[in-house]
Amino acid sequence: MKIQGTIVDLLVAPLGPGELLLGFVGGGMVRGLVVGLLTWGVALVFAGFQLAHPLVTLGFLLGTAYVFSVLGLATAIWAEKFEQINFFPTFVMLPLTFLGGVFYSISRLPEPWRTISHFNPMVYMVEGLRYGMLGTGALPPALGALILFLLAVGSTAVTYALLARGYKLKQ
């Protein structure tokens, strides 16, 4: 929207930064959850299983979708060209995801890599979802929920500040 110039329509509307944040993040969450649920539905066809802790799974799904949506909005505000939009997902999120225990349990890593992986916020999202879906995880889900909450609060504060200042939006 910003690069195409249609963001002007939203900026002149009587919407505050909180309302813009809520709208963009809500839309991003819905999109992410639909993609995730469709992926899970296809996986059920090939390997049916029961969720070990459905409420924990739902909580981590919502929290993870929220954080990714807020970070996506912050990236969109920061980017000035289409090429820059892919910087954050490609050079930050993708490596953190692959090093975050998606394809392996961090409990199997040798030291010092196990300790280093605890500084990756993606580990806590992955382990929380792993616990909720499979009933097992290398980290306590309460710790993962706390880290996810702190990440959500921090990313929301930064993105809200960017919207409130009109950073790279009002040019």
Give the predicted meaning of each segment.
Residues G16-P17, S105:
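Short coil/turn motifs that cap or connect alpha-helices
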Residues P17-P89, T136-Y160:
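Alpha-helical transmembrane segments and their short interhelical loops
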